[in-house]
């Protein structure tokens, strides 16, 4: 009987031993912690899973689940029913294709953060996140979503990441309306085309909005944001928007519009503090550089004072909450839009502690030097810290310290401040504290935990004075700064006297004005505008007169006159360039930065630049041809075959026109374009091709003027030395050579400085600013167009003859036309004959009077036929014609007129004319 009792007991013991031995093996085979890394504090990290472990095998205290690089796995929709304490679920870098609706237990879920980044998600079940009432952060970045996730119920999401989903093309009004707590919306690299009216009407807490690299975005409706919008950050880099709404941006602090090709005008932004633009529209910063426009920052608060050594000092103004921190005293840096917080109100409680070890949002993140970028890295390695999420300083930032750069925030929250404790060793922090880089508007989370143990500052906060120093904390920078200038405004309310304190903060706008984009008018100085306007007007009139006179002349067109016509045309175009440029400068004075797109980047500047380069090159080529023509005429006067024929001259000038046209067209192709500076000249030497073009242009011009100088030096030497020329030709050519030398040296005076400074600038040795260059290029450059018509036309007798002849045709300057045409002697002779005939007629019989009149007519007809042999004499006689019958009736007036002619022609007539006049006047009646 005893044996029978012993055997079963032995078997039972053996069974229990075997069960004890195999149970760990069985459990290990099915336990999630064998496939994943489990932390006693409730953190589970899984990598490269083939299938998702059974939910029942996860620790019941799991608060953080991190699954990545696990291929195409399926996440059970009831995961939150089994893991009731789960707060942070990150499923990044997998191959998940869809998201089913999450089921929760008793309508409640503890999930705070959900991340699905870098998957291949295409569809999300309708209302998939509706039951996640505690969800504050949802990240669906870098997937293949084709539409915005649908929210059928009001959600508590504050941060929504949808970047990297180009299939999302519309913003659904219903879904956004169910996100009233939304503060940050990240829509970078999506396919959104328009921000419609009233789309953010329910999102009154929206602070940060990112659409950068959304190239499809072309329009923001004027009513996209409500008047009471809280939007502070708007990033539109690399989009296609052309304007911003004038309403709903009154609280905007940060605006980025880099690489937005067609954006040319900023609306009124009362509270703006930072603006980032591209170099081609950086002129918009001129509105802020003047110092007349500031950002405003006003808060209403009750006055409070503190007694300190018998002195009453106003307390520091209460600012708006820190950008990435809740509560906590804030320290205002001298840089605009910066905030630094140190824990929550006196640094109680720990801070960030999730989740350590990197990942999303693991351990915090470190931001690169590029703006608006974030990269995750592992948590800190200090013992003890990190505990408790969100804990005192906790989420979203256990306190932050702002760097000296504008709009940057760095956190030093997390365990380690008093009460911090608990958590995983080296916990890091999500979002924990953040350490901001030196680049504007960047954030780096450096892990929450970090400083050992508790202790630290007492609760309650520390009052700030006008200038204060942060108490020494290990591994934390010290900072001393002054708050912005305060402008108090009293306002009486039923609760007591309150007042507004406004900080007047200068706006930081990037890029700053540079040498090629100064914040000034087109011409820079007022006096330069006035003088250049007069220069342009005179050049226009003078060269137009020269061209009209030469083209309407009845003389044969020879080589010299042909070259003069070309030079007058070129100088007229250059005068037109100066006249238009100064006119535009006068119209846009004081407000040019609002006209840059219309003028400098428009067709007007390109056309004007083309005219400037074309006219200058054509003028230079024509001067070279005129110099060569005079050189052969003077130095090789005896060699008739060596001179330029009219046909050769025309061919050369056709080549000159082609050269000038090519040089003017090149900048229109993008090589050293005309839009670099406001005066529309090819200043751009940013690449090798542009530098080569500018250098070639200046070298050709320099070589041309050196050649002209050499030829004229030879001509002057021959004229002065006499050579083999006869006296008369020598005297005539001497005058011509000296006149042409003055012309060329005047051109040299204008061109030499331009060539010198231009070549140095083309090769990187800039000695003048753009403003100084305007004086050189716009004031001295067109002097040629004024000098040339006077030097080669108005100061020569030949041109005076042409001018007065042309004027006589329309009834002006008839007598001077007779003088320069050489017909004045014939005119005086005929007048004298008529005078004597009239005197004799007074004493003769009617028959003799008739004979005298017939004789006078016959003499006049003979004289008319004689003078009509040449066109010039015919022109002079016709313009000075008279009626013999009328003269006989007005003999006293004729006598007086002849007497007046004596005095007029006494000193100006040649000797043979004087002798002829004396004979006529002394002849008997």
Swiss-Prot record:
It is a multi-pass membrane protein. Residues 1-27 form the signal peptide. The chain crosses the membrane at residues 530-551, 562-584, 607-628, 652-673, 692-712, 740-763, 775-795. One of its GO terms (cellular component) is plasma membrane. The keyword Signal applies. Sequence repeats lie at residues 333-349, 350-384, 385-419, 420-453, 454-461. Keywords: Cell membrane, G-protein coupled receptor, Glycoprotein, Leucine-rich repeat, Membrane, Receptor, Repeat, Signal, Transducer, Transmembrane, Transmembrane helix. PANTHER family: GLYCOPROTEIN HORMONE RECEPTOR, LP13728P. This is Probable glycoprotein hormone G-protein coupled receptor. It comes from Anthopleura elegantissima. The lineage of its organism: Eukaryota, Metazoa, Cnidaria, Anthozoa, Hexacorallia.
């Amino acid at each position: 009987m005893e044996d029978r009792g012993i055997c079963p007991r032995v078997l039972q013991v053996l069974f229990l031993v075997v069960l004890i031995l195999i149970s760990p093996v069985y459990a290990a085979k099915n336990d999630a912690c064998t496939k994943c890394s489990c932390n006693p504090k409730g953190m589970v990290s899984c990598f490269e899973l083939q299938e998702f472990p059974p939910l029942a095998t996860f620790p019941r205290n799991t608060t953080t689940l991190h699954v990545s690089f696990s291929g195409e796995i399926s996440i059970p929709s009831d995961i939150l029913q089994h893991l009731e304490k789960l707060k942070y679920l990150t499923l990044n870098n997998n191959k998940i294709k869809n998201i089913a609706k999450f089921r929760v237990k008793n309508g409640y879920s503890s999930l705070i953060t959900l991340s699905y980044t870098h998957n291949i998600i295409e569809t999300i079940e309708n209302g998939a996140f509706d039951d996640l009432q505690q969800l504050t952060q949802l990240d669906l970045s870098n997937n293949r979503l084709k539409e915005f996730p649908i929210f059928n119920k009001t959600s508590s999401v504050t941060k929504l990441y949808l970047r990297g989903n180009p299939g999302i093309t519309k913003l659904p009004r219903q879904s956004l309306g169910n996100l009233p707590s939304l503060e940050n919306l990240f829509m970078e690299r999506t396919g959104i085309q328009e921000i419609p009216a009233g789309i953010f009407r329910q999102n009154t807490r929206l602070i940060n909005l990112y659409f950068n690299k959304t190239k499809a975005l072309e329009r923001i409706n004027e009513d996209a944001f409500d008047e009471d919008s809280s939007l502070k950050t708007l990033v539109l880099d690399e989009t296609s928007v052309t304007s911003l709404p004038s309403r709903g941006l009154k609280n905007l602090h940060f605006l980025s519009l880099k690489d937005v090709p067609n954006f040319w005008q900023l609306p009124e932004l009362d509270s703006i503090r930072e603006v980032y633009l591209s170099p081609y529209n950086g002129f918009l910063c001129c509105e802020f550089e003047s110092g007349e426009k500031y950002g405003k920052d006003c808060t209403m608060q009750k006055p409070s004072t503190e007694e300190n050594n018998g002195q009453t000092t106003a307390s520091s103004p209460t600012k708006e909450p820190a950008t990435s921190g809740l509560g906590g005293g804030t320290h205002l840096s001298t840089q605009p839009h910066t905030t630094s917080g140190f824990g929550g109100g006196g640094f109680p409680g720990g801070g960030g502690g999730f989740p350590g070890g990197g990942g999303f949002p693991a351990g915090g993140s470190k931001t690169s030097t590029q703006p608006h970028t974030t990269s995750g890295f592992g948590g800190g390695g200090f013992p003890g810290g990190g505990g408790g999420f969100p804990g005192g300083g906790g989420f979203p930032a256990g306190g932050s310290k702002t760097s000296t750069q504008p709009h940057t925030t760095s956190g030093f929250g997390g365990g380690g401040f008093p009460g911090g404790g608990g958590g995983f060793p080296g916990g890091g922090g999500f979002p924990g504290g953040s350490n901001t880089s030196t680049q504007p508007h960047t954030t780096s989370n450096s892990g929450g935990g970090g400083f050992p143990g508790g202790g630290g500052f007492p609760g309650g906060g520390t009052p700030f004075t006008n200038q204060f120093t942060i108490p020494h904390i290990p591994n934390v920078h010290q900072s001393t700064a002054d708050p912005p200038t305060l402008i108090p405004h009293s306002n009486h309310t039923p609760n007591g006297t309150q007042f507004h304190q406004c900080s007047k903060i200068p706006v930081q706008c990037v890029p700053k004005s540079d040498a090629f984009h100064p914040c000034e008018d087109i011409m820079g100085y007022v006096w330069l505008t006035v003088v250049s306007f007069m220069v342009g007007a005179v050049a226009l009139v003078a060269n137009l007169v020269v061209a009209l006179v030469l083209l309407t002349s009845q003389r044969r067109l020879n080589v010299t006159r042909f070259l003069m016509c070309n030079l007058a045309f070129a100088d007229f175009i250059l005068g037109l360039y100066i006249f238009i440029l100064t006119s535009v400068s006068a119209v846009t004075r004081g407000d040019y930065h609002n006209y840059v797109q219309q003028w400098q980047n428009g067709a007007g500047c390109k056309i004007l630049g083309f005219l400037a380069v074309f006219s200058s090159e054509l003028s230079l080529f024509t001067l070279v041809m005129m110099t060569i023509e005079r050189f052969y005429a003077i130095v090789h006067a005896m060699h008739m075959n060596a001179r330029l024929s009219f046909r050769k001259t025309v061919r050369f000038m056709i080549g000159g026109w082609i050269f000038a046209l090519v040089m003017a067209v090149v900048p229109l192709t993008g090589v050293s374009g005309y839009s670099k500076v406001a005066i529309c000249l090819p200043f751009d030497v940013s690449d090798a091709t542009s530098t080569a073009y500018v250098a070639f242009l200046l070298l050709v011009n320099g070589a041309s003027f050196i050649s002209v100088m050499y030829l004229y030096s030879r001509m002057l030497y021959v004229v002065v030395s006499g050579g083999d020329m006869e006296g008369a030709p020598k005297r005539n050519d001497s005058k011509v050579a000296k006149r042409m030398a003055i012309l060329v040296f005047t051109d040299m005076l204008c061109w030499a400085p331009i060539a010198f400074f231009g070549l140095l600038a083309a090769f990187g040795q800039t000695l003048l600013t753009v403003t100084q260059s305007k004086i050189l290029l716009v004031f001295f450059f067109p002097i040629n167009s004024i000098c040339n018509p006077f030097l080669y036309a108005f100061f020569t007798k030949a041109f005076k003859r042409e001018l007065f002849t042309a004027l006589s045709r329309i009834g002006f300057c008839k007598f001077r036309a007779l003088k320069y045409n050489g017909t004045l002697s014939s005119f005086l002779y005929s007048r004298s004959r008529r005078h004597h005939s009239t005197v004799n007629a007074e004493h003769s019989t009617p028959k003799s009077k008739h004979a005298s009149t017939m004789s006078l007519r016959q003499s006049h007809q003979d004289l008319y036929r004689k003078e009509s042999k040449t066109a010039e004499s015919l022109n002079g006689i016709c313009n000075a014609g008279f009626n013999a019958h009328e003269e006989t009736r007005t003999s006293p007036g004729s006598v007086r007129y002849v007497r007046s002619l004596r005095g007029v022609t006494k000193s100006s007539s040649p000797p043979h004319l004087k002798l002829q006049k004396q004979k006529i006047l002394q002849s008997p009646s």
